[in-house]
């Protein structure tokens, strides 16, 4: 039988998805982690300090965060004078709709800080914007890179989901990247 000291969860604001009311009702201690609402990449990383506090590891978290900030700023400086940024788009379609990160999202900020030209930087907001597949194909067909495609282990898996993915130049050139390093050493 489990008897946790604390359960960390997130809250969406939608009763059908949130588990914390039931957990609290069951007498369990709950803390809400809202890191996913943070649009600044370093702000998201700083939530590690919040988690560290529950383990009395604040000093270690502060040190790691400070090192991360320094590395991040160094990386930004490396591309700050880039004259021809690469073009990039993100994500994949889900049930026929492509949820593209808004131009103020942490994904858009990460790409800009990396010296990339995010094809959808003009989308309003920090959340994902629903787009038709055809709209994405029209705007991103010639993009240099495609990131954040999910937990794919091989490129051909994308085409197995939707053959239209093969129409993207990034797919044809093999410049498609997942966010999961757990799959291969290169991500």
Regions from the PLM with identified roles:
Residues 60-114:
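Basic- and aromatic-lined ligand-binding clefts that recognize polyanionic substrates
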Residues 6-10, 32-38, 49-62, 94-101, ...:
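Second-shell loop/turn segments in exported
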